[in-house]
């Protein structure tokens, strides 16, 4: 791994065990994973959702894997009667302590937990059990890192983000997307399409929606009545993006 900018649409990113630097990797197995369950229609009446984190969904003192979740945890979830799992943020992220919410590579499934094919096998197995899979997708902000992330992509610190003073999130130590830019809208919408088509996720739970919708990011807001929700302090560009994504 060397300190070179990772392209914004890298679909596989790994960390060098010695240098700790993240680098893009070509993922082209001789036999790409083929889904056994070609089509899947989730049961939604009612939708019983089990929220989970791949790395923490086991009892051992280590980071869990896609395979371990598929082999050990999925059967227990099915046995308990759930028909949907919501996987907490798995887009590639440099800091594990962020639980996956400081994303650096938006098109890459975190290599901490295994390979892209192993994640596909997990989703395929869930569908075979009648379990829908929702992805906790992070489009509300991005990690500030410049080597691993988009913080200074192609030498432009504002290519994807608002300029100061709106560039940095006041509470999350991260960068805020500028939803008024066409390239940002296209980037994020194509990201949604990628996860649905490549991995066959059944839908999304959008993280940090309040932060996206309000200029205040919801900080210091009580939201006690309708006037608090519709007070004129909403970001119309963010509303437009979420409408398109939906």
What kind of feature is each model-predicted range?
Residues 1-5:
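Short, small-residue-biased leader/transition segments that mark boundaries at the very start
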Residues 7-47:
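Basic K/R-rich, polyanion-interacting modules in nucleoproteins and related proteins
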Residues 35, 71-72, 244-245:
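Short alpha-helical segments and helix-capping/turn motifs at coil-helix boundaries
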Residues 38-44, 53-234:
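Substrate-binding/active-site clefts of carbohydrate-active enzymes
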Residues 49-51:
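Active-site-flanking beta-strand signature of metal-NTP-handling nucleotidyl enzymes
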Residues 77, 245-246:
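Hydrophobic, Leu/Ile/Phe/Ala-enriched alpha-helical segments that form helix-helix packing faces
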Residues 237-245:
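Polar, glycine-rich mid-to-C-terminal structural blocks
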């Amino acid at each position: 791994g060397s300190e070179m900018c990772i392209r914004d649409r890298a679909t596989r990113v790994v960390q060098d065990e010695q240098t700790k630097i993240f680098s893009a990797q070509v993922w082209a197995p001789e036999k790409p994973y083929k889904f056994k369950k070609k089509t899947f229609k989730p049961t939604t009446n009612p939708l019983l959702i089990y929220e989970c984190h791949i790395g923490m969904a086991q009892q051992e003192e280590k980071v869990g894997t896609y395979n371990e979740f598929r082999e050990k945890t999925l059967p227990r979830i099915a046995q308990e009667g759930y028909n949907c799992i919501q996987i907490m943020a798995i887009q590639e992220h440099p800091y594990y302590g962020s639980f996956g919410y400081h994303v650096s590579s938006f098109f890459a499934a975190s290599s901490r937990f295994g390979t892209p094919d192993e994640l596909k096998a997990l989703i395929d197995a869930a569908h075979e059990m009648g379990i829908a899979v929702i992805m906790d997708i992070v489009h509300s902000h991005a990690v500030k890192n410049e080597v691993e992330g988009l913080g200074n992509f192609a030498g432009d610190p504002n290519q994807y983000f608002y300029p100061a003073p709106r560039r940095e999130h006041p509470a999350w130590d991260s960068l805020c997307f500028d939803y008024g830019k066409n390239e940002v809208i296209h980037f994020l919408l194509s990201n949604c399409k990628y996860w649905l088509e490549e991995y066959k996720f059944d839908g999304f739970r959008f993280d940090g929606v309040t932060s996206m919708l309000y200029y205040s990011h919801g900080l210091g807001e009580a939201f006690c009545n309708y006037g608090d929700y519709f007070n004129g302090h909403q970001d119309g560009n963010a509303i437009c993006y979420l409408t398109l994504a939906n």
